[in-house]
A protein has these predicted regions:
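Glycine/serine-rich phosphate-binding loop and adjoining beta1-alpha1 elements at the start
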Residues: 1-64, 261, 265-268, 276
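General beta-strand structural signal in soluble alpha/beta enzymes
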Residues: 9-12, 33-36, 67, 91, ...
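Short, ordered loop/turn segments at secondary-structure junctions
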Residues: 12-15, 36-39, 94-97, 141-142, ...
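Generic structural signal for well-ordered, non-membrane alpha-helical segments
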Residues: 14-18, 22, 38-42, 70, ...
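Glycine-rich phosphate/diphosphate-binding loop of Rossmann-like nucleotide-binding domains
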Residues: 35, 43-137, 141
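Adenosine-phosphate binding glycine-rich loop
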Residues: 36-37, 56, 161-270
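Rossmann-like adenosine-cofactor binding region
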Residues: 110-180, 186-187
Length: 277
């Protein structure tokens, strides 16, 4: 089908098949291929965290981050956080802290993460991992945390409990026990929803006939989404724009198109400011 389409958006493919399928398609096709459960979620996560760190006055390269759930979305979130400058990241799954295990025992999709993380990590359970950390990112299952777990973290903690339909901690408790709290649900503030990212990413990629969606384009998309919240409006309950914000898609499209051109994957030359609507 590739000759008749400008891009392919993969949806609802479980790990580890999603990594293998996306890699095979990207290698064999000359049109953009993106698994939005991975990269769409990761882009919006980075946008939300960028703004959350501004609110609490912390820096990406200084904070200690726990990512719980290393499936499709969790693995992609780790990768984009590392690309954005995170320097202390702890990866957990149902077995606890897993990225510090023997490389030969890790799934293939995790060995590259292990090569990028710092070696001074704790060993043990998720609860051990939380001690002295600044950010919790949950992409796992509901109700794995309680108030005492969050109190093991540093002050001004940021908690993104993104499991659906039930977040990793009961929302009322999570909101009370953290400085900034976000979920994947629309009935609470700060919804982290991949619908904020993939329409604009593909719009920008298609407009310049990009041959791929690369890391620079995803980082640019995250920056554009974060920028849709004016600095003067940023607050604990407003770190990410609404999915109904009409400015998001065109703004993301323009920055993605510019990043595609800057990285040499755009095959159509257009005036970014004038031709992207």
């Amino acid at each position: 089908i590739a000759p008749g389409f400008g891009g392919i958006n993969l949806e609802d493919i479980s790990a580890p098949r999603c990594f293998e399928i996306e890699r095979a398609l990207k290698t064999s096709l000359d049109i953009p291929v993106m698994h939005d459960d991975q990269h769409g979620t990761a882009v919006v996560l980075l946008a939300a965290l960028t703004n959350a760190l501004k609110v609490v006055g912390k820096r990406m390269e200084e904070v200690r981050i726990v990512v719980n759930g290393l499936g499709a979305a969790g693995t992609a979130c780790c990768r984009i956080l590392l690309a954005a400058g995170a320097s202390h990241l702890i990866g957990c799954d149902k077995e606890g802290i897993v990225l510090m295990g023997d490389a030969e025992e890790l799934r293939a999709c995790r060995t590259d993460l292990q090569a990028c993380i710092r070696r001074d990590q704790p060993r043990g359970t998720l609860h051990d991992a939380l001690k002295g950390t600044d950010v919790f990112i949950g992409l796992s299952v509901g109700n794995v945390l309680n108030r005492e777990d969050l109190e093991r973290m540093n002050q001004d903690r940021i908690v993104f409990a993104m499991a659906n339909p039930d977040p990793e901690i009961e929302p009322r408790v999570g909101d009370e026990a953290s400085r900034i709290f976000a979920t994947g649900r629309s009935d609470f503030p700060n919804q982290i929803n991949n619908a904020l990212s993939f329409p604009g990413i593909f719009r920008g990629a298609l407009d310049v006939q990009a041959s791929e969606i690369n890391e620079a384009m995803k980082l640019a998309a995250a920056e554009a989404i974060a920028g849709c919240v004016p600095a003067e409006a940023l607050s604990e309950d407003y770190i990410i724009p609404s999915v109904f914000d009409r400015d998001v898609v065109p703004r993301v499209a323009k920055t993605v198109a510019a990043a595609a051109r800057a990285t040499g994957v755009a095959r159509r030359r257009i005036r970014i400011d004038d031709d992207l609507r």
